[in-house]
Amino acid sequence: MSRSFLESTTVGFGRAFTRAMLSETTAQQRGLLQSLDPRVRVVGLFALVLAVELSRKIAVVAALLVVAVVMAVASRVSIFTLAKRVWLIALGFTGVIALPAIFVTPGRPIAALGTVAITEQGLRTAALLVLRVETAVTFTTLLVLCTPWSHVLKALRALRLPKEAIVMLAMTYRYVFLLVETASQMFESRRSRTVGVLKPQGQRRMAARTAGVLLSKSFALSDNVYLAMQSRGFRGDVQVLSDWRLTMWDFIALFGFLLAGSFAVWMGR
């Protein structure tokens, strides 16, 4: 583990906190989604994600992706942020999974690579899979970026999601941040005590020790997080300062979400 690795790891943890702060900042913007009741956002975006998964036509899924981009612009979400954090990652991950479909799906061959043929049906299948993932992840990211996490949990609880699920989601969110903070402090401490460049054998020993200590701390941290939440009165019901009341605009937006989702499912059959 060389100094450059320690520095890059510490910078990576810093970027994780920066992205978290970006989500909180975006949620405070005055935009389309931010102006809606959190319950409407959860139900509406979930309806659009469901429509994406049920649609079987590339044109319909592509149209939903355009809708997602328009919603992002109207909600003051950076397109560069979406491209960097969502689209490129989803494209790389899904592309690896969809690549074999180009060759193994039976259909009319349009090109040949030796004894393997690329089929038209295979290209359509791969394109549909990639578009579905890109669009669904975009809608989900918009929900996370435009809604504080506590509001998401309260909206899910208002929609009768079991308390056990709310507790798991709340604990996971807090646990991940505390674990990242602990790991960041460990690497920062190690970097401040490292002089010069370690040999490969020393790098491996240090990496193993750091991973072992972090694992042991993670077990203790999980208990501490749960006990801290319990001591502060958390029982699965999320409390926020704002009082939610559905307005006429919320009902219109909810109707628009459901209508768009239903129309997409009907057109994508």
PLM region spans:
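Structural signal for the C-terminal ends of transmembrane alpha-helices
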Residues: A72-S78, C146-P148, W266-M267
